[in-house]
């Protein structure tokens, strides 16, 4: 919702994208805006183009943003936390919409999210990042079945499991390092519980490279490889 300008109508904002990038006039831009709103599942798009952002729901606002992002038929759509602050039902609708649009338009989606459930549902391949670095990369099924990096294991271990009884959820101790002054070695070392005292000495001073431990499965950790 906050990405939309509160003082301009929805139609103006969608049409502006088309005017800037495709040099469409106002009339043609509004006509295309109606088509785009219809494509992303907004009811009565002919009326909604005249609405202001505060007159639509959070889910509809998210659909408007997706329409604006797809207006120029990009080859790649970068979706940064597209379901944040939406209730579970609306989240599912937005994810279904993105999946449907991907199949219809052929647009690739780079999905940025902290929600492992969304990743499991949407992704083909996953890149796990910690403190500004890639620590693991693998096909989604491989990552969930066989996580290798201690941080990835910690993320998956913190997810509640239906039917599993435990007093508290697993947590990763410590906090993220200062990115303005990162540690010289492995950035996860201060929080890592996987390395022993001997290995920790190396982890403190040497940042491990990203290595391919299995076909298509990359990890940044001294626990793996012949390093």
Predicted feature locations:
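Conserved Q-loop
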Residues: 3-12, 87, 121, 185
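Short coil-to-helix "N-cap" segments within the ABC nucleotide-binding domain's helical subdomain
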Residues: 8-38, 46-50, 139-150
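ABC-type ATPase nucleotide-binding domain
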Residues: 3, 11, 16-21, 129, ...
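Conserved ABC ATPase signature
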Residues: 51-56, 60
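A short, proline-enriched helix->beta-strand linker immediately N-terminal to the Walker B motif
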Residues: 71-75
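P-loop NTP-binding/switch modules centered on Walker-like glycine-rich loops
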Residues: 78-82, 86-168
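Short catalytic/signature loops enriched in Gly
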Residues: 43-46, 139-227
